[in-house]
């Protein structure tokens, strides 16, 4: 049976660790937080991130990275997007070239505007990378609620190995070779979810959210295709599927942050109240720069940028969005 090491014992990493542990896989969870480590190893819980769950005994938490990695055939990067490069640097010289790297973070590297698999390839060029993405909240995965994701890689053999590793009666995995499209969909949908939350916070209704999600889907496809993704990817699980769940669920930290901003809080205040990383804020800045560079029209991203980084009032920004020049509906 395989051994899987997770870098990061947060909500999603822990949930996937539980899933694998229940399948009989040996799982190690590496984290810096000694309280989290003790809670997992002593109490078989991780109350800091997810309540009301029991962690199997074949899931062990470590503070020592070498111990966590010992014997692992797969390493799952379960850390926020802005620390992916640091995490990969920490893996150098500690894993063999045949270890498959599985990334579950969604975002883009701030400053370089690289996709996360590109960052991983820069730091660990000899290891194959698989992106595991799609509509999934840790709170539901940990409870065994039916969930479907995509394992995407340039190496289809690796994607199929990850598919076999995670497939379970309540956890279905499809494979996909469009890693560009999968990563762009997973990153941009966080911006749209923020905007959807803002609409909820202002008090707008279902009409507004339906329009925003639909036109947001167009923005995702537009920038994704420009960057080399396949059109069909954006209408699958990692595009439309992920967009739906992130824009509509209260499990979504991006939507929750957007609600707070719509109610008048600043981005900084919203992040503090949510208490976890809000990837859509960093993604908004990165894709604002990328769409300028690539010459892609992304009006929702434009408006989100004005609210997040230029101090525009949410209601005024929505008016700007609605009052643009008339045009034909198209992607």
Swiss-Prot record:
SUPFAM superfamilies: 6-phosphogluconate dehydrogenase C-terminal domain-like (SSF48179), NAD(P)-binding Rossmann-fold domains (SSF51735). Pfam families: NAD_Gly3P_dh_C, NAD_Gly3P_dh_N. The keyword Cytoplasm applies. GO terms for molecular function: glycerol-3-phosphate dehydrogenase [NAD(P)+] activity; NAD binding. One of its GO terms (biological process) is carbohydrate metabolic process. It is an enzyme of class 1 (oxidoreductase). Sn-glycerol 3-phosphate binds at residues 106, 134, 136, 189, 242, 252-254. Its main location: cytoplasm. Pathway: Membrane lipid metabolism; glycerophospholipid metabolism. Keywords: Cytoplasm, Lipid biosynthesis, Lipid metabolism, NAD, NADP, Nucleotide-binding, Oxidoreductase, Phospholipid biosynthesis, Phospholipid metabolism. The active site is at 189 (proton acceptor). NADPH binds at residues 11-12, 32, 106, 138, 253, 277, 279. Its EC number is 1.1.1.94. It is found in: Cytoplasm. It catalyses: sn-glycerol 3-phosphate + NAD(+) = dihydroxyacetone phosphate + NADH + H(+); sn-glycerol 3-phosphate + NADP(+) = dihydroxyacetone phosphate + NADPH + H(+). One of its GO terms (cellular component) is cytosol. NCBIfam families: PRK00094.1-2 (NF000940), PRK00094.1-3 (NF000941), PRK00094.1-4 (NF000942). Belongs to the NAD-dependent glycerol-3-phosphate dehydrogenase family. Catalyzes the reduction of the glycolytic intermediate dihydroxyacetone phosphate (DHAP) to sn-glycerol 3-phosphate (G3P), the key precursor for phospholipid synthesis. This is Glycerol-3-phosphate dehydrogenase [NAD(P)+]. It comes from Clostridium perfringens (strain 13 / Type A). The gene is gpsA.
